[in-house]
Swiss-Prot record:
This is Large ribosomal subunit protein uL13. The gene is rplM. Part of the 50S ribosomal subunit. HAMAP family: Ribosomal_uL13. It holds the Pfam family Ribosomal_L13. GO terms for cellular component: cytosolic large ribosomal subunit. The lineage of its organism: Bacteria, Bacillati, Bacillota, Clostridia, Eubacteriales.
């Protein structure tokens, strides 16, 4: 019996909506990353983008467990000497919650062309309003 290899033109994409309110950031991000990769489908093929589109709402209400809000730092570098910028997650979530969630998911995806293609299928919104009503997204209940 031969192994099945998905072809890009045969992939059927669905739209899912996830409510991130009062759920841990890492748990939501890992499940969203898995759906973006297509690992929930029996037709998953590592070198083909078989994933679905995901809309995440209420990202400003996401939770970090323990003391991570104050102790964990979001870092980026300006590429100049001494250009390391660090801010605690409490400030980062208050200023730009969409970026914090997208970064968490991006770091869980492959770091190449395919990973960037997968990340384009992620739509993140602060609040419960989104403008993807026409796609008729299914509500996705997360496993944990």
């Amino acid at each position: 019996m031969k192994s099945y290899i998905a072809k890009p033109h045969e992939v059927e994409r669905k739209w899912y909506i996830v409510d991130a309110a009062d759920k841990p950031l890492g748990r939501v991000a890992s499940q969203v990353a898995s759906i973006l990769r297509g690992k929930h489908k029996p037709t998953y093929t590592p070198h083909v983008d078989t994933g679905d589109n995901v809309i995440v709402i209420n990202v400003e209400k996401v939770v970090l467990t323990g003391k991570k809000l104050d102790q964990k730092l979001l870092r980026h570098h300006s590429l100049y000497p001494g250009g390391l910028k660090e801010i605690p997650y409490r400030e980062a979530i208050a200023k730009k919650p969409e970026f914090v969630f997208e970064e968490a998911v991006r770091r869980m995806l492959p770091s190449g062309v395919l990973g960037r293609k997968m990340l384009k299928k992620l739509k993140v919104y602060k609040g419960a309003e989104h403008n993807q009503e026409a796609q008729k997204p299914e509500v996705l209940e997360l496993r944990y």
